[in-house]
A protein has these predicted regions:
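Short regulatory alpha-helical segment in sensory/regulatory domains of signaling proteins that mediates
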Residues: 101-109, 113-116, 257
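Conserved segment of winged-helix/HTH DNA-binding domains
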Residues: 79-108, 125-127, 132-137
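Juxtadomain coupling helices with adjacent low-complexity linkers
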Residues: 226-263
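Glycine-rich acetyl-CoA-binding "A-motif" of GNAT/NAT acetyltransferases
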Residues: 223
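Short hydrophobic alpha-helical segments used for membrane anchoring or interfacial signaling
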Residues: 113-119, 127-128
Length: 263
């Protein structure tokens, strides 16, 4: 039987003070990330703690290499790049997915992305710019709502009904006037996506940007991510959007799945 005290570390697992300290440290990091830098006084006000307490937390995080201080303002340190890269490459699919996303961008001329689902959200693991691509906010590491993106809906269509329900229960955030916010409408579309094999995003995440996404599954049939291509809606329309790009996308996705099978 395990004791509440870890015999190796001496840490008391039931000590609420230790948990609160950890939670507050992470809250500070989230505040600094959200606001792209914070002053100690802002941290103290946001967290309802004294100025001295805020300074202690900030100085400790600086000492540990997680924050840097510039002109009295605290920012996230580059250490997070190292941590993020390790987390990203922990996904075995990443290293080879990068190669196929590059192929997809080159063949389509569009911006391509590879995303995965984690904690009921989508995360961009890789993005590649084609010859005619535009910037679409698809930065590596960015978290996105699955229901508002082509790759996200492709993943959703491959998840269990229970997991889809949990994602819907979080709320279907409206990103544009075209975002699907009705659970019944989303479920109907997911059925179509399963039958068709790919998903469309018609200006549902960013006004003026369309996208097509397809799920990537492993040998057991479990979805491990999704590729997508995106571009301006005035270019991605008609047969190019509904037929040509889906065929390019499915071809490269199938090649990648074959590589997974043979590896």
């Amino acid at each position: 039987m395990l004791s509440a005290v870890d015999s190796q570390t001496g840490m008391n697992d039931t000590n609420p003070e230790k948990l609160t300290t950890i939670e507050q440290a992470f809250e500070i990091l989230e505040l600094i990330h959200t606001n792209n830098g914070e002053k100690p006084s802002d941290i103290a006000d946001s967290m309802d703690v004294s100025s001295s307490t805020a300074h202690r937390y900030l100085n400790t995080l600086v000492e540990k290499g997680y924050l840097v201080k510039e002109d009295g303002v605290y920012y996230l340190a580059l250490k997070f790049l190292t941590l993020g890269e390790r987390a990203r490459t922990r996904k075995n699919v990443y290293t080879s997915a990068e190669e196929y996303a590059d192929m997809l961008a080159e063949e389509s001329g569009c911006r391509s992305t590879f995303i995965v689902e984690e904690n009921l959200q989508g995360i961009y693991l890789y993005t590649s710019a084609g010859s005619h691509s535009v910037w679409t906010q698809s930065t590596i590491g960015k978290r996105i709502p699955l229901h508002a993106t082509a790759g996200g809906k492709a993943i959703l269509a491959s998840l269990s009904d229970d997991k889809v329900a949990r994602i819907i229960d979080q709320g279907l955030e409206r990103k544009t006037s075209s975002t699907i916010t009705s659970a019944s409408t989303l479920r109907e579309q997911l059925t179509t996506i399963r039958d068709r094999g790919y998903a469309f995003n018609r200006e549902e995440q960013i006004q003026g940007v369309n996208a097509v996404g397809a799920p990537v599954t492993d040998n057991s049939g479990e979805v491990i991510g999704a590729f997508s291509v995106s571009g301006p809606s005035n270019r991605l329309n008609g047969d190019r959007f509904t037929s040509e790009l889906p065929q390019i996308l499915l071809g490269i996705t199938n090649e990648y799945e074959l590589r997974i099978t043979l590896s």
